[in-house]
Design a protein with these regions (language model features):
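Structural helix-adjacent loops and short alpha-helical linkers that scaffold large soluble proteins
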Residues: 128-140, 183-190, 238-241, 302
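Terminal-appendage/accessory-domain detector
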Residues: 1-112, 208, 213-223, 230-458
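Well-ordered alpha-helical segments within folded domains of soluble proteins
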Residues: 116-123, 170-177, 223-227, 289
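Short glycine/serine-rich loop segments
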Residues: 121, 169, 178-185, 190, ...
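Aromatic-lined, polymer-binding surfaces characteristic
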Residues: 146-172, 218
Length: 458
């Protein structure tokens, strides 16, 4: 299917309805093979994050909480997790797991993690509805389009007001994706989006403490987005029309934006899922270009971490809340420029092991983390969010200065993560839960663009 909102924006149609119509049309005119392949890559990445996340104490605690609330087993599985649950519980718990280790994908221009809300919601529903893989992939494409279209309009206005765009826009994307899978028409999908918008929320207050609440934002969005789609199908309530751009709608409430005609979404040459990134490193995406710069410096110059007197990072304003974060917990360390920069310099890589409690007590990394400074520059600001730049300068004890500029981090649409690298990332994550033979089979199966039953993932 061609990405053409001009055809969807019929006379008198609102931008919200045009998005809903576009989602509904995916069932009749499926995306191109290239777009489906990209959807499969994001699904592979997301399910790998989900499997790894299921082993985290925070996720296990969330599972125990849900078990205590509802002791009766449900019909729907958890990918990589125990027992069976209601469809809403499954969606919410898988979304928390997807985001637990900062491995999940994102979209820079919207500053959003779309897959962590969309994929778990559609997977849980797909299991319940006995859907096939191609229908699932199409619904994921639809959910990305809605979530990113909202988020890229809200960003940076919403974050400046203290809102995180992932739960604000992600809940509406999850609703659109689930409504698409359920076979609702444009009016029904718009109703689901309208219902979901009342569940939008999520604050950036965690940057000042309580960082693990961030992990629950996608869980809320996935669960309530799915609930909204089910409500729309059953006719339980009618969602407000034009909920994105309308008076007191999403854009006005969260971004102070009073006018939106959807033109930015219409003008995109590629669907949102093809413009979203996959992470090579399990940490905040704002830090990735600086990691790439350190890796480039290691590749072209002979130096050791012990030679470094100071690490100077230049970045853009949206990244600055991470400039001086501590690293006392795994969740906050993954968002901390000082810790990640020091880790990259000392170990020459950034992996999950570098955020463990044992790693966070290492004297060598702690000493270098104290020597990291981060500054906002006009040069970086002028390029963001169209690109995500950073410059890293290492000041060596010898007096020498080594500097590297990265215009866009690895994993972006312009610098895509290779299939081989994605498969390695997925294999490492799946390997925490599944035996080697199952890992190989999973990766191969998720790359098959065929209508095989989603039940095979149970």
């Amino acid at each position: 299917m061609t990405h053409d909102f001009k055809g969807s924006l019929m006379a008198g149609a609102t931008p919200t309805r045009a998005l809903a119509d576009w989602c509904a049309a995916l069932r009749d005119s499926r995306p191109s093979e290239a777009v489906l392949r990209e959807s499969a890559r994001h699904v592979l990445d997301t399910l790998a994050a989900c499997a790894a996340g299921m082993r985290q104490p925070l996720v296990r605690a969330a599972i125990e909480l849900e078990r205590g609330i509802n002791a009766q087993p449900g019909p729907v599985a958890l990918f990589g997790g125990p027992e069976r649950w209601t469809v809403l519980e499954s969606a919410g718990l898988m979304a928390v797991a997807c985001h637990a280790l900062e491995m999940d994908d994102g979209n820079r221009e919207g500053s959003i993690h779309p897959a962590t809300t969309v994929v778990p919601a559609v997977l849980a529903l797909g299991w319940q509805q006995e859907a096939d893989y191609l229908a699932f992939l199409c619904a994921v494409v639809a959910g990305f389009e809605v979530a990113v279209s909202i988020a890229e309009t809200l960003h940076p206005h919403a974050s400046q007001r203290g809102f995180q765009t992932t739960p604000v826009a992600g809940v509406v994307g999850a609703a659109a994706a689930c409504a698409t899978l359920l076979g609702l028409d444009g009016a029904g999908i718009e109703s689901a989006m309208g219902l979901a918008a009342s569940a939008s929320g999520g604050l950036f207050a965690y940057l000042a403490g309580g960082g693990n609440v961030k992990k629950f934002h996608p869980g809320h969005a996935a669960r309530e987005g799915l609930r909204a789609a089910l409500m729309a199908r059953q006719g339980v309530a009618q969602g407000p029309r034009g909920v994105i751009e309308g008076r007191a709608g999403l854009l006005q409430a969260f971004g102070g934006i009073t006018q939106w005609d959807g033109s930015r979404a219409r003008e995109r040459a590629a669907p949102a899922i093809a413009r979203s990134y996959l992470k090579p490193y399990p940490c905040c995406r704002h830090i990735h270009p600086a990691i790439d710069a350190v890796m480039a410096l290691k590749a072209r110059a002979a130096w050791q971490a012990a030679d470094v007197a100071a690490i100077e990072v230049e970045t853009y304003g949206a990244a600055m809340p991470h400039a001086r974060l501590p690293w006392d917990t795994l969740e906050v360390a993954q968002l901390s420029f000082p810790w990640v920069m020091a880790l990259a310099c000392v170990d020459g890589e950034v992996t999950l092991a570098g955020f463990s409690e044992a790693a966070r007590t290492r004297p060598d990394i702690n000493a270098l983390a104290a020597c990291v400074s981060v500054a906002q520059t006009q040069e970086c600001d002028s390029l963001y969010p169209a690109s995500g730049p950073a410059r890293v300068t290492l000041r060596l004890r010898s007096g020498e200065r080594l500097s590297e500029w990265v215009a866009d981090p690895l994993g972006s649409a312009d610098r895509p993560l290779a299939d081989e690298a994605l498969d390695r990332k997925a294999a490492e994550a799946f390997g925490l839960v599944f035996p080697a033979a199952r890992v190989r089979a999973l990766i191969g199966q998720l790359r098959r663009l065929e209508p095989w039953p989603l039940a095979e993932l149970n």
